[in-house]
Amino acid sequence: MIGITQAEGVMTIELQRPERRNALNSQLIEKLREAVQKASSADSEVSTRVIVLTGQGTVFCAGADLSGDAFAADYPDRLIELHRVMDAVPMPVIGAINGPAIGAGLQLAMQCDLRVVAPDAYFQFPTSKYGLALDNWSIRRLSSLVGHGRARAMLLTAEKLTADIALQTGMANRIGALADAQAWAAEVTGLAPLAIQHAKRVLNDDGSIEEAWPEHKKLFDKAWTSQDVIEAQVARVEKRPPKFQGA
């Protein structure tokens, strides 16, 4: 489900579920978490200074595997733990965004410290198409990376963010391919790791990880337990537009 290659101080982790557009099921989440943890382990045989994360095929990650176990009770906790591990590792994670990053795939891309984005890639949160709600961190981080106005368009209308616009907003640091991300990572391995670790920690401790306000949690739970979520799933199977009722 994942491939790992090591070139001196750069570990490249590749999501390998191209038949499902690298959609995240629990097994893939766990494999990815273990790989990231291994990179920062003191017991690791090779010293890793930078992680590069990419996807196999033409899609970076299509999001949660809605035809798999994405609605399992423990799925959100597994995803949160993966994000926590990526946040906690001392080395930078460079996302080589080789194609669309959608839903949970966009969350994964935002959890990366830097992003090199393919020209034909795009970012999208289609939650309003499925009746779902996002956690506060995802909304805050999106706003910090693309600006408040563009974040509103992406969240309220499921608007796509193309690579060229992503470069303008800061969601993309560079436009390029996996090789470009790996070359940049190789450059970073020559920089001072403790200075990088400090900067990453301060940047990530920006207040975006917060306890949801009671009203936020109420609306979040209301969305996830609504009939609209069921309607979206049924409509997807029946290949028709959903008829949302707001209930």
UniProtKB/Swiss-Prot annotation:
Gene this chain is encoded by: echA6
Domain of life: Bacteria
Lineage of the species this protein comes from: Bacteria, Bacillati, Actinomycetota, Actinomycetes, Mycobacteriales
Catalyzed reactions: a (3S)-3-hydroxyacyl-CoA = a (2E)-enoyl-CoA + H2O; a 4-saturated-(3S)-3-hydroxyacyl-CoA = a (3E)-enoyl-CoA + H2O
Known function: Could possibly oxidize fatty acids using specific components.
NCBIfam families associated with the record: PRK07854.1
UniProt KW keywords: Fatty acid metabolism, Lipid metabolism, Lyase
Name of the protein: Probable enoyl-CoA hydratase echA6
E.C. no: 4.2.1.17
Disulfide bridge positions per record: none
Family statement drawn from the similarity comment of this UniProt entry: Belongs to the enoyl-CoA hydratase/isomerase family.
The species this protein was found in: Mycobacterium leprae (strain TN)
GO molecular function, one term: enoyl-CoA hydratase activity
Alphabetical GO biological process terms: fatty acid beta-oxidation
Family annotation (CDD domains): crotonase-like
Database matches in Gene3D superfamilies: 2-enoyl-CoA Hydratase, Chain A, domain 1 (3.90.226.10)
